[in-house]
Design a protein with these regions (language model features):
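TPR/TPR-like alpha-solenoid helical repeat scaffolds
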Residues: 146-156, 175-192
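Canonical tetratricopeptide repeat
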Residues: 11, 45, 79, 113, ...
């Protein structure tokens, strides 16, 4: 009977989400978490809804509980890092992203998050290492490459930024052009 009640609330919430009715979905997750306060799915889902609504403190409260009940879940730590970064609590965010990569070394988003937070903390050498790992894991995603090029410019290492711009031209020419405009590094039309 308990399992049926749980599934009923979970499916209610999911149904409301499919219909785009976030307030009703949130109410269903509230009911679910009243009965099962340590439910990882309910905590993570409600945290996500709060974050979507810009309620980062509430999202963080749910995520903190999620981390407590699922301490070995890399995604819980990644989400915690994201929320802390959104709240400009960069040192705490960094610790969460690091924990996420310890638990799941191939979690590219956590490496990217680390890179962004390290940039905010002006720890550029460490940011380079994190962003390089992100680009190794996601070589065709322009986001890590873009940030890596920006860090190289900030570190007064334009030669490395130029290499990245050339690399990006091969699969993301618009991002390469944006970097050229933003950095003032005009590469020309050569792809070498």
């Amino acid at each position: 009977m308990m399992r049926l009640a749980y599934l009923s609330l979970k499916w209610q919430a999911m149904g409301w989400l499919v219909l785009g009715r976030h307030a009703q979905a949130l109410a269903a997750f509230d009911k679910l978490l009243q009965r099962w306060p340590d439910d990882a799915y309910g905590l993570s889902s409600r945290a996500h809804l709060h974050a979507q609504g810009g309620r980062f403190e509430q999202a963080l409260a749910d995520n903190e509980r999620w981390v407590q009940v699922a301490a070995d879940n890399a995604h819980a730590w990644f989400n915690r890092g994201y929320l802390l970064e959104s709240l400009e609590r960069y040192e705490e965010a960094l610790a969460s992203f690091v924990r996420a990569t310890e638990l799941a070394p191939k979690l590219d988003r956590a490496w990217y998050g680390q890179g962004l937070v390290l940039i905010r903390l002006k720890r550029y050498d460490e940011a380079v290492a994190a962003l390089k790992r992100n680009t190794e894991l996601q070589p065709m995603s322009p986001y890590g490459w873009y940030q890596l090029a920006r860090v190289h410019v900030d570190r007064h290492n334009p030669e490395e930024a130029v290499k990245i711009i050339r690399h990006l031209r091969g699969f993301e020419p618009k991002v390469a052009a944006q970097l050229e405009r933003e950095t003032g590094l005009l590469i020309g039309t050569s792809t070498r």
